[in-house]
Amino acid sequence: MLGTFSINDKLGKRLVAILKGFPCSWGRCNFCPFAIEQSFNTRDVIFTNRRIINEALKTLEKEDHKRIAVFNGSSFHELPYDTIEKLRELAKRHIFEIESRSEYINISSIEALLSYYEPEKLIIRIGFEVYDEKIRENLLNKGMPNTELQRIYRLKNEVKELGLPIEFWVYVLFGIEYIPEEKVIESIKVFKKMFDGIIAIKYKKYLPSHPKEVPISEYLAKFLEENTDLVDWGGEQWIIERRD
């Protein structure tokens, strides 16, 4: 999955850069496959990401993209400084999307990102996955209780009052055994009132220890398409591969 690609979907034309990351500091979500592509080797992470960022910059020279999305399978703030610095040229004057766990996000950290990258807009994606706290904490083991959910909601409102060009988007997970369809629907209805955008993610099982995939109804598929900003059904570009 590492690399760059252009995509044109409900969010418009985007340039996506999927970077190599260090293992997530939390690392206990029981469905997450991203450790497969991560590394403890700092040199490996730095030089892999230099190559990917250079590819992205070359693409920008040939094609116009207003929206740049950067993913690294953990939190943006866990990337090495070399990578953080080299992303400035990609981010400046673009709509810049990153992913993060909630604990890294506060008014100081996001103001620092705005100052450093000077994006047209900063979009922060957070994987709360489901509104139901018992499912999120006891079954998915996310480590993001409702206190964090409410804190990020208050932060979103504070950012709006300050007039900062920042949006908070959340992921909702579906097609996984622990989250019944009615809880997926509940999550979307609640999160639509709380945050700026929702992306629904179809779960894919990668490891034997991971929860099972479950089929979804036509009703849920239609509901997702009509009530979220994007449904990520998966695709070849998102396949995670072990790279030793």
Label each region the model flagged.
Residues 2-51:
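Canonical Radical SAM [4Fe-4S] cluster-binding loop centered on the CxxxCxxC motif
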Residues 26-29, 132-135, 207-209:
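Short acidic/His/Gly/Ser-rich catalytic and metal-binding motifs that mark active-site loops
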Residues 34-79, 91-106, 120-149, 169, ...:
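Core AdoMet radical
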Residues 43-48, 140-148, 179-186, 212-219:
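Alpha-helix N-cap and loop-to-helix initiation/capping positions
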Residues 59-62, 87-91, 111-121, 157-163, ...:
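Acidic (Asp/Glu)-rich catalytic clusters
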Residues 79-88, 106-116, 181-184:
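Distinct, well-ordered alpha-helical segments
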Residues 147-210, 223-237:
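Conserved C-terminal portion of the radical SAM core fold
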Residues 243-244:
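Class I (Rossmann-like) S-adenosyl-L-methionine-dependent methyltransferase catalytic domain
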